[in-house]
Every structure is written in C-alpha cells, then in structure tokens.
Amino acid sequence: MIDVPHEVIEKLQIFQDLVQKWNKAINLISENSTQNFWKRHILDSLQLIQYINDKEIHLVDIGSGAGFPGIILSIAGVASTSLIEADLRKCIFLEKAAKISNNNIQIINQRIEKTEISCNILTCRAFSNLNTIFDCTKNISVQNKFLLPKGKSYLSEIKEARKKWLFKCLINQSITSKESKILEISDLTKII
C-alpha cells in the first residue's frame, strides 16, 4: 500500500469535493464512478507516485480532464506539473483545482499535437491506446519515461505499438485492479 501523509489526504479530500461539485455542470467523471471515487480515481492516480523516484521533476499530463493523474501527483509531491487539456471548461476547473496543491501547476489549453514542451515524465489516464499516445506527443520531449495506467488490453496495445515503435517497457501490477497494469515506457523511437 502507499504511505500517504495526513496533509496530503486532507488535500485529496478537498479535491474530491471540488470534482464532485463541478461534475454536475461539466461532466468531469462518469456518474457511475462517483460512488467509488477514492479507489477509482484518487488511489488509481496516486499509485503512480511509487514509480517517480525523484519528485523534483517536470511531469506532463495529457488530456488532463478532471486532473487525474496530474493534480493528484502534484498534491502528492511532484514539484512541477503541466496539464494539457483542449476543453476550455475543463481548464477553468483545473485552474481552481491547481490551487489545492502546494507545488507548481501550469494549465495549457490547447490540443496535445500542437504542444511543444519538455518533461521528465509524461502520463495520462483513460486517454487512448499506446500508438495514439505516441503519435500525438511527438512534439513533447520526454526525457525519462512515459508512466501509463492501462486496462486489460495492455498486451495487445504493446503488440500493436511495437509495429511502429521501438521502446523498453516495464509492466507493473496496479493496486486498484487485478486486470490493470502500470506501464513504464522509455527509449521511444519511431521505426515507420
């Protein structure tokens, strides 16, 4: 299990309240997932922190939506986070949510394909398959790794991606679901 300081838990509770308040207006998360919010969203995002050895990094979260996992990781201690989100309404929410964290959070309201930025780690949650993630982030310089929570189709996604890309991939077990994995992908190179 993940050891989380009391102060972080308090901030995550504030974030949960904010998501649930805004969800009525802009549909940040599915109504079905509100009953199991802590496990489904908070813990599922928070578990990524165990794969971030140095918190003094710049992390990019693409398709940030409701702030999972980017805001959660910032609250948990990641020093600098950029959230890339095309939907202006969600960016307004993210601006409010960013104030909960003591760390630096930048909100970028534009399409991922048009974003040129450098980071240590790139993450996203419930965004797309590996090929799409790699294709749309070609202008983002990822220095260390992609850190990606994936569901039961992770093996077929890896197989498909290897047709177009060379990469190293560590597969870790998710703590929120037996079917889910956390992929650590590095040394990405396009082959076709």
From Swiss-Prot:
GO cellular component, one term: cytosol
InterPro entries: rRNA_ssu_MeTfrase_G, SAM-dependent_MTases_sf
Pfam families: GidB
EC number(s) per entry: 2.1.1.170
Record localization: Cytoplasm
Functional note: Specifically methylates the N7 position of guanine in position 527 of 16S rRNA.
Listed name of the protein: Ribosomal RNA small subunit methyltransferase G
Organism: Rickettsia bellii (strain OSU 85-389)
